[in-house]
């Protein structure tokens, strides 16, 4: 299996063979986000909201640990229920706490609605979302006026950081009719890694590789793709994430 967006550390910490991750891990993403909040945004107090799922809860747990080391005051770490649409209970808690920022760990449907509802409540705290919010749907759900000034972590480089990536983004939009985002890019990269692994296994086996041969090929695969070079450590994590 090759995953494009599974950031929970347990994905590659279980010793599974044939498991590769092209994106970053929670224990890299969340501390980097906390550092950004402290050093770039100048935040002193922050309210954490998670979706009570493996991804969101893991992000907030790692963020909280890093934030405390940096001297950020975490005023709360509250959960919301995935697939719900009314977050008034936690929004009221945020309003009462009046933090410098709100950090959301989870995916974009709930994260976008949370942003809309805290702005509708008149809360002006800076909004920072995890990589699960990295999609154009944030603007569609939260509203353009609410998305302005919001931050979220992106797994992918900036689209205009290279001509190759920008060309891919343009082709993706022309072909699919959808706006490219971090999900699209890293699922493409995951497919590229999987196909290269299969191709290498087929070549090595003379046409019909066994499962074990495919797993072996995955362990040594190296791919030059649109966002850079993909190589993996003994756990299956991307060395360049």
Task: Report the location of each language-model feature.
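Extracytosolic ligand-binding ectodomains
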Residues: 1-241
